[in-house]
Amino acid sequence: GVKRVVGTDTSARALLCAQDNVNRLNMGKQITLQQSDLFPEGQADLIVCNPPWLPGRPASTLEQAVYDQDQHMLLGFLSGLSKHLAPKGQGWLILSDLAEHLGLRSRAALLAAIERAGLVVLERLDTRPIHPKAKEEADPLADARRAEVTSLWRLAVG
């Protein structure tokens, strides 16, 4: 199993919430949290990133969890991953294709960014949403949400 987890976030508020969860689960010896942009120092066998799913400019702190301005987190994760992975390590990218259904990013652009970063896709595991919004007809994004797939992209240095 995993002996040590380092979690990072740029938001002090998000880190406080995460620390509350770490404490509640009594995982303080295994999990440390750092305020950092993407990667902690050093290398790791596994690095997981769940960036905001939509390219766009957040208008509030809350929207920073939804909108990734200039795709900073997504592209930063991909471009910095090889430097931070231990030999034979993997990067796991958790990403919805909602942006593709809304015409905000193409699958080809995502695959090109992966390739530019010198990474290869080992596997992609997909799941469809089961949350209530996926079935809400009044939602203006109902068609896109019904078509949405969230994927775990297993990446490695090529």
Report each predicted region and the residues it spans.
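C-terminal lobe and adjacent flexible extensions of AdoMet/dcAdoMet transferase-like proteins
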Residues: 153-158
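S-adenosylmethionine
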Residues: 8-150
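Conserved SAM-binding loop of SAM-dependent methyltransferases across substrates and taxa
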Residues: 1-3
